[in-house]
Amino acid sequence: MLLLLAAALPSLLWDGPPDTAATLRQAGIERIQVPAAQYESWKSAGGLAVEAAHPDGAIQLSSPGVQYRANVASATTTPWLVGNGWRILRNPRGRFIYDAPGAKAALAAAEASCFGADAAVHTDAAGLKPFAEIISMLRAIGPNGPPVADIGFIDDGSPAAGEVINLLVRDNLLVKLVAKPDPAMKLNVAFGSKEFPKEEAGNPPMMAHDIRGHLTDERRSLRIFGSAVVVARLTAAPDGVRVHLLNYAGAERKIDGLRVRVLGRYPKSHVTAAGSPADELLDYSVDTDATEFTIRELKTYAVIDLAR
């Protein structure tokens, strides 16, 4: 079981020389991938599991984070999330490589795990400890169950459809890519259909808003309040669900007082958070059809296991 879990965790892609092994161990790193040309020289490094990297065919992902764009209409700045969840959803069997320096290595590892990616994270010395902390957390919580989705999206593979998927993920609309309408989904979206014509794809935010309107907020399995830089995911568990919260601004600042609403009655909860105190949830309430709570502080990544 431990070997299977290790294989499912994001790995560290490290191109430093073997004399950096002590630095890796001190940071809490236990497993690395190295360029094939360096593999023989790394084999004798004690205290580390070393594999040869095979980057051919891997998809290069962006370093996750937040960019702030000027909003001319309101003379303010609007956060734009640089996230890769939509690309992972489009390539469920793909292999991925992040180039994520410093604290962004933690977010890259969390994003990869949250979306179920087979990923390696290339980082620098400043990223070693943040990466190791996330890996330690992922080992502690164990593997995720299957993702929960409200929307089945029939993807035609076009760039326009990709941008709509990206916006659905950013707006915390739980989407699953399907080849044909899935009766288990609350809403099926056929990109290019009469209801969702391709002509609207010239304005992807409008199409994402239209999809949200068809679903309705009342039927959404998961909603968050209080931040525009947090992406939430939901995975199934044997006796409940697991809520994933990714703060894409986590390399710069934490989020205080994030409110979460999950459809279903879940009187039991357990919080595991990276870079933040694992406090009890605040203002916890279980109503007739939903569970709500506030997480006091979110640094990079938090997982809330809810049970009946």
Task: Give the ranges of each region predicted by the language model.
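C-terminal beta-strand-rich structural cap/linker in extracellular carbohydrate-active enzymes
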Residues: 192, 287-308
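Carbohydrate-binding surface patches
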Residues: 150, 154-173, 186, 226-266
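Extracellular/luminal ectodomains and secreted, surface-exposed scaffolds of diverse proteins
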Residues: 278-288
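A glycine-rich, often tryptophan-bearing local segment used as a flexible ligand/cofactor-contacting loop or short
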Residues: 188-224
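Solvent-exposed beta-hairpin/edge-strand motifs
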Residues: 259-279
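Low-complexity, Gly/Pro
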Residues: 1-8, 250, 254, 301
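Glycan-processing catalytic domains of CAZymes
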Residues: 4-198, 292-293
